[in-house]
Amino acid sequence: MEILPQVQDALNFIHSVNVTHIEDKLQASRVFYEKLIPLAGTQEAVFAVEDKTIEFTDRKISIRIYRPDNKKKLPVVVYFHGGGFFKGSLETHDRPLRQLANLSGVVIISVDYRLAPEYPFPHGLNDCIDTTEWIISHAEELGIDSHCMAVAGDSAGGTLATGVAGKLNNILCQVLIYPATESSLATPSWSEFAEGPILTLKQANELWEYYTGGKINAASTFNDDLSGMPDTFIITAEYDPVRDEAMVYAKKLRHANVEVTEILYPKMIHGFVQMGGVIDQGREAIATIAEYVRYKLVK
């Protein structure tokens, strides 16, 4: 495995983060993830950024809206952050989503769904579905075009995004960035990269335990019939244990006659799209996603 200099710089930064003073393992992992924010680069200015809280009957969900200009009825991408279902926030993905809004020219709405293990499956997925439905029903208030909508997410967020796409009918496309699509962790890439970098087999088993409350097979977020899924863009990384399951999912979608665009980034690692401040390919991937979104949504 050839580690490129910029990837090594990112790994060095990650290895320098110290959270040993936090005794609670779960909290330490969450704080650790927040401390990786600088890898995304500087915080770009966006025309408007607004935080809102959606009040459902039984819970509140926060969203962050990135608006690239003051035009009305812009297309929209609803984004679900990664973090293994148990960490991540509006802040961990703020910088890449600012970049995506500026490069794509569409509204990006980031969803702060509830996290496992406090809220195991299906709470997080239901939050994502319900929030997307709320966005659709409040399109005029939000200044978006609900008929030009995509969902997107990275890692566990990609899992949630495709779960939403399978439940709702008016999603034009989905962008899945190294999505976790198989809880068995049995593909060759899990053997090849069991010790990482970034994501290990042990960590993956733990996150699926968190997400499912120990009932791993219960967390089926995918329909058996994929024929109704929207056009799909999947990004994978060569040195990523999730690589093969994402590629298998792409193949299943194609067999269901879904249009799939797929890019494998050579010598990249899990999470590289969040590391665009250090790794050039991370920023390039965001630009490529922006181009895809514009092509699919901007009429």
Regions inferred by a protein language model and the residue ranges of each:
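Short beta-strand/loop motif that positions the catalytic acidic residue
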Residues: I234-T236
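Hydrolase active-site cap/lid region
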Residues: G166-G214
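Gly/Ala-rich beta-loop-alpha elbow adjacent to hydrolase catalytic centers
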Residues: G153, G157, A161
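Catalytic active-site module of serine/aspartate enzymes centered on a nucleophile-bearing elbow/loop
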Residues: I279-K299
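Short amphipathic alpha-helix adjacent to the substrate-entry channel of hydrolases
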Residues: E91-S110
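Short beta-strand element of the alpha/beta-hydrolase
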Residues: K73-G83
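Gly/Ser-rich "nucleophile elbow"/oxyanion-hole loop immediately N-terminal to the catalytic nucleophile
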Residues: I136-V151
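A glycine/proline-hinged amphipathic helix-loop "lid/cap" segment
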Residues: M1-I65, V298-K299
